[in-house]
């Protein structure tokens, strides 16, 4: 190593004067390196950087989209819920009104029916009473006539007379009844 | 000052150790980054992560921060190649047995500075046309009567001194570091050989100093690679935006 320094010092060469061969080697070496860097290294690294940025940004965009979709769906559900509530209320009100209407109709109908039945019953009773009166009148007349003929031994076969007698008798009875009722 | 050539052995001009190291540096850098970039995955492995960190340092901390804009990607390959070419060639000086920073020989520094010089002038002319030379030498906002002084200064500093300082800064720091380590080594060797025990003992002091200098040199080797690349980015940026300076 001493030898090197001594030789360098005694050589007397100026260190600022370049060796052209060394310049050539540096130039060629740098050119090769630059070519490799331009052609391969930088594109490969840039490709990865771009892919990575895209992966991250794409993920964020995807998440944002999902978020937006979720909140839209939530909005929609809320809207539907509100609509459904309103619908239910409306149906309930309608049902209530309808029920009241039906009830009123039924009441009215029942009242009419009962009135009708009552009137019918009255009429029937009246007609039956009338029939009973007529039949009673006939039967009682016959019975009474037979009884009286038996009692008085008088032939009362003359119908006209008999009917007259019976009518008179019944009229008396009715008058008595009417008097008693009063 | 040149080391003896390897081929032919010992000749003054021939294939030297320095040339071998330059070629080796190209192989090292290309191999490392091609391996790191070969299997590109979104989630990087160790090697890919190291490659991306190194690439991202030049791309973002130098090219993007200094040049900026949307144009900076065009200059990333040049800055990237320069940074790692100089870094590896400088670090040689810190590796035992190799211990020769390639740019302690001035030729390589001249070549790289010349490449950068031609590049930024070409960029300036392409961007601003021939009036780029006026933009680069006539500063705006300077009173007319000072211009006769300012214009020569600008011409000298931008077009003459700039490439010289750019190359010599790299070369001189590497040569100085190389010499200091070499002289310290020789000094230790010389002192250890002395018969006088006290004199022999002083070699320890030299050794301690040499180790400190070695650490400093290692730092400067990395720093000079960064400085050279940073200045390149600044020159390119100045040429791109000459109209706004």
Swiss-Prot record, chain A:
CDD domains: ATP-synt_Fo_b (cd06503). F(1)F(0) ATP synthase produces ATP from ADP in the presence of a proton or sodium gradient. F-type ATPases consist of two structural domains, F(1) containing the extramembraneous catalytic core and F(0) containing the membrane proton channel, linked together by a central stalk and a peripheral stalk. During catalysis, ATP synthesis in the catalytic domain of F(1) is coupled via a rotary mechanism of the central stalk subunits to proton translocation. It comes from Arthrobacter sp. (strain FB24). InterPro entries: ATP_synth_B-like_membr_sf (IPR028987), ATP_synth_b/b'su_bac/chlpt (IPR002146), ATP_synth_F0_bsu_bac (IPR005864), ATP_synthase_B_chain (IPR050059). The keyword Amino-acid biosynthesis does not apply. This is ATP synthase subunit b. The chain crosses the membrane at residues 25-45. F-type ATPases have 2 components, F(1) - the catalytic core - and F(0) - the membrane proton channel. F(1) has five subunits: alpha(3), beta(3), gamma(1), delta(1), epsilon(1). F(0) has three main subunits: a(1), b(2) and c(10-14). The alpha and beta chains form an alternating ring which encloses part of the gamma chain. F(1) is attached to F(0) by a central stalk formed by the gamma and epsilon chains, while a peripheral stalk is formed by the delta and b chains. Gene3D superfamilies: F1F0 ATP synthase subunit B, membrane domain. The keyword Ion transport applies. It is found in: Cell membrane. Belongs to the ATPase B chain family. One of its GO terms (molecular function) is proton-transporting ATP synthase activity, rotational mechanism.
């Amino acid at each position: 190593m001493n030898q090197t320094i001594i030789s360098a010092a005694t050589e007397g060469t100026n260190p600022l004067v370049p060796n052209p061969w060394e310049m050539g080697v540096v130039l060629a070496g740098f050119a090769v390196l630059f070519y490799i860097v331009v052609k391969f290294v930088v594109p490969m690294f840039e490709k990865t950087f771009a892919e990575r940025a895209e992966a991250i940004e794409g993920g964020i965009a995807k998440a944002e989209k999902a978020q937006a979709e979720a909140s839209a769906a939530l909005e929609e559900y809320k809207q539907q819920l509100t609509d459904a509530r309103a619908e239910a209320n409306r149906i309930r009100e309608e049902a209530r009104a309808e029920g009241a209407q039906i009830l009123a109709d039924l009441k009215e109908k029942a009242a009419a029916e009962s009135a009708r039945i009552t009137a019918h019953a009255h009429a029937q009773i009246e007609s039956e009473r009338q029939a009973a009166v007529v039949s009673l009148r006939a039967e009682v007349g016959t019975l009474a006539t037979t009884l009286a003929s038996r009692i008085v031994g008088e032939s009362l076969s003359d119908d006209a007379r008999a009917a007259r007698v019976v009518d008179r008798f019944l009229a008396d009875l009715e008058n008595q009844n009417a008097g008693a009722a009063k | 000052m040149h080391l003896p050539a390897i081929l032919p052995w010992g000749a003054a001009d021939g294939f030297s150790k320095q040339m071998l190291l330059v070629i080796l540096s190209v192989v090292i850098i290309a191999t490392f980054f091609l391996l790191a970039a070969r299997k590109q995955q979104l989630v990087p492995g160790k090697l890919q992560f190291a490659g991306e960190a190194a690439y991202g340092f030049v791309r973002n901390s130098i090219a993007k921060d200094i040049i900026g804009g949307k144009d900076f990607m065009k200059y990333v390959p040049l800055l990237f190649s320069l940074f790692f070419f100089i870094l590896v060639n400088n670090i040689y000086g810190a590796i035992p047995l190799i211990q020769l920073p390639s740019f302690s020989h001035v030729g390589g520094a001249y070549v790289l500075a010349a490449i950068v010089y031609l590049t930024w002038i070409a960029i300036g002319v392409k961007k601003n046309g021939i009036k780029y030379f006026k933009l680069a030498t006539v500063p705006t906002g300077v009173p007319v009567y000072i211009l006769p002084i300012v214009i020569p200064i600008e011409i000298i500093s931008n077009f003459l001194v700039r490439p010289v300082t750019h190359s010599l800064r790299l070369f001189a720091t590497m040569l100085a570091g190389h010499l200091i380590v070499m002289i310290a080594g020789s000094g230790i060797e010389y002192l250890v050989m002395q018969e006088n025990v006290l004199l022999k003992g002083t070699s320890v002091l030299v050794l301690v100093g040499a180790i400190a200098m070695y650490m400093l040199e290692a730092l400067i080797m990395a720093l000079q690679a960064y400085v050279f690349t940073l200045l390149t980015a600044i020159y390119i940026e100045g040429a791109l935006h000459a109209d706004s300076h």
